[in-house]
Amino acid sequence: MISVCMATYNGEKYIVEQINSILSQIKESDELVISDDGSNDTTIEKVLSFHDQRIRIYHGHFHSPIYNFENAIKHAKGDVIFLSDQDDIWLPGRV
């Protein structure tokens, strides 16, 4: 199983394109773990609009980018973990 761990904070500008670029490369048995650091824009709504069972989101209060990545990693279940910043668009073949 692959876990892609993403840290977000007010990432509404790129989040949809980014999630699409990741989901197109992972299997149904893989996961996208998103840790949101207290976004106050539409990031959460855009993530939830996917209705994809591979996506798990953890939304909390603002801490720091490091804490945010650690939070995503601690919730990951995969044997292999990829990290993704909130504005990364994954080109084909990354996974």
Regions found by a protein language model. Give the residues of each.
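Short, well-formed alpha-helical segments that are part of the catalytic scaffolds
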Residues: 11-24
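Active-site acidic Asp-centered loop
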Residues: 37, 84-86
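Acidic donor-binding/catalytic loop of UDP-sugar-dependent glycosyltransferases
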Residues: 42, 88-95
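Glycine-rich, basic loop-to-helix element that forms the pyrophosphate-binding segment
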Residues: 60-76
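Short aromatic/hydrophobic "clamp" motif used to bind/position activated sugar donors
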Residues: 81
